[in-house]
Amino acid sequence: VTGLFTEPTGDFGHNPEPLEKNLGDIKALMQKGGHDLAFVVDPDVDRLAMFCEDGTMYGEEYTLVTVADYILQHTPGNTVSNLSSTRALRDVTRMRGGEYSAAAVGEVNVVAKMKETRAVIGGEGNGGVIYPEAHYGRDALPSC
């Protein structure tokens, strides 16, 4: 395990948005080899981005889909994402035998729809994952 920018100094080493254009350091580290996967979070740790072993960023849009696929393999159930997210979550949910619901944009709307449908996971396409087993809020850490 290799950490970058892990000391809470108050100074951020780059623009804190977990977008590929801001993450050259982690991309370069991954391209050097020796690591299988990289997890990147924003300063308040409510969004997660991932990098593959070759330094390719696994887009934020697919973070929720990837985590949901794993969760649904172990805890079958329903999912929710906002209307501006990829259809991939719907497809994965159906493949795993659950029901997918779309919510209006905004964490509060996603959470309300999750409670209404008893979803086991939900979130937004910007890397925000909501895992009710932990709590009803976007949180990157349970996704890792």
Language-model features and meaning:
Residues 1-143:
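Phosphate-binding chemistry for phosphorylated carbohydrates and sugar-nucleotides
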